């Protein structure tokens, strides 16, 4: 049995709030770079081009992307055009329907999606667990149109579970080769000590039956991560404590085939994860002697306390109960190969498109379990 997990960070479109999170920091960098270029008395063609880009990014250009578009129906088709253009007649028999729509998401770059697909195809898993999936329709299209051609056939079963995230993000599990999804238990209703949602994106338990009839429990999680302004270590510790209670409940029921996967938001030796990791009831694959790294530059001796290609492995985990951990014969991490753009300056090293903010491609963790 091969299990793979990945924080997919959306399949086809991403909520605009992700763009706004770092807007102030980006704007500050753009202003500093623009000012430094402006002071240069001998500007070259490349520098002038960069200044035009910065003017667009900072809102000087009239071509800046707007949060609203006009939606028109013409000849049986819908068209969009930016606001602020020519005034148009409202709905009439001649013009047809006119209206406006607020954009809540933006499309993701195809190359980032293809890089993720390549990682999944290399892992070739029987069970695939994904975090931060936008909706079931996108999951279905992704499975059929992207994974199917790469894997010689789409996953036979898939399940999307939406949690508490107001952007609609949720978890997904896909299975094939005789592995069947037979049970699901949500934890979206659980509260923290302050009465708020304990898990911002739920923490679903999936029950999977193997081709031999054995039962496996997979818990997909997305714990709180610290931001620039907020420390979530207390809440993360409460989440880890609750995850530990799920394991104890399952062990008490005689279910010792348990996998916990996803983002825990902390280093393995961090205090907030002690309730889950200190007694080693579940262990991470990065500790295993057969753990391997595959990416743009393979790095031997990689551990969950180190970095590779700018990604901190210590925040993403594939944990296995002791029984399953002893059955691992291969495991590792795949890093998506995303083409790097040509550097332009130290402050803004890549050309940036407002609707395609460069993101760090997430890794894929996988484990091969013998006799399961």
Show where each model-derived region lies:
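N-terminal, active-site-proximal structural segment of metallo-dependent hydrolase catalytic domains
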Residues: 1-149, 159-165, 364
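Metal-dependent phosphoester-hydrolase catalytic domains
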Residues: 2-4, 192, 198, 249-259, ...
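Structural recognition of the beta-strand scaffold that forms the well-ordered cores
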Residues: 2-5, 126-131, 173, 217-220, ...
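Catalytic metal-binding/acid-base residues of hydrolase active sites
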Residues: 9, 134, 222-224, 264-267, ...
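Structured beta-strand-rich core segments of catalytic domains in phosphoester-bond hydrolases
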Residues: 64, 127-217, 221
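Stable alpha-helical elements in mature extracytoplasmic
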Residues: 112, 116, 135-138, 236-239, ...
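Active-site environment of divalent metal-dependent phosphoester hydrolases
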Residues: 135-137, 166-168, 226-228, 265-271
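A long, amphipathic alpha-helix that forms part
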Residues: 230-256
